[in-house]
């Protein structure tokens, strides 16, 4: 049975950077890794409503720097910066060294796979029809300038007794092209019928400059997204995969 490699893992060091940037000797490595996991778990719970996409942890000598990518920086910063100061004190207690928190605002959340997956999962938990949630997410991402997007949901869709998988795709999603900027995320929706898994792939274009372009991106002027109908663009595809034949009512 064929399996797919993780879209981000295969691109690390090519067009993607790691979420943790630090070095440690073998005796300290386990301790640092545990603290990183505690920081990510703490921030994920505390900033649940802030639409946090990514958390980058760096460890300069005798200190720590945490960069939070969020679509709602006002929630993280708080009134007059009170919340971010409190957040720095809490992270300092967890990491054991002075922690500095910086905010990276996400201008276009519809091009972020994690935020799109969270939005779909939230709609599924509110009993929105899964096809409507998928199609809405695809349309919003393509309207925001994505070159292609694929959304997949799996589980007891619509309350069916037999679990199945359905997907929806528009545009190109070249998973085997390493220079392709593919954003990927998974999310779980806890519904009354059980857990539904959500996967999102978003193709945002190609990075021809490699890691130099990733680390030092050139400023670009915002332009309205062009909707072409080139190879694979403007095409919609649907798919369905079941462990067994779906019941006649579906």
UniProtKB/Swiss-Prot annotation:
Residues 220-250 have a biased composition (Basic and acidic residues). The keyword rRNA-binding applies. InterPro entries: KH_dom, KH_dom-like_a/b, KH_dom_type_2, KH_sf_prok-type, Ribosomal_S3_C_sf, Ribosomal_uS3_bac-typ, Ribosomal_uS3_C, Ribosomal_uS3_CS. The keyword RNA-binding applies. Coiled coil: none annotated. Binds the lower part of the 30S subunit head. Binds mRNA in the 70S ribosome, positioning it for translation. NCBIfam families: rpsC_bact (TIGR01009). Part of the 30S ribosomal subunit. Forms a tight complex with proteins S10 and S14. This is Small ribosomal subunit protein uS3. It comes from Acinetobacter baylyi (strain ATCC 33305 / BD413 / ADP1). The lineage of its organism: Bacteria, Pseudomonadati, Pseudomonadota, Gammaproteobacteria, Moraxellales. The gene is rpsC.
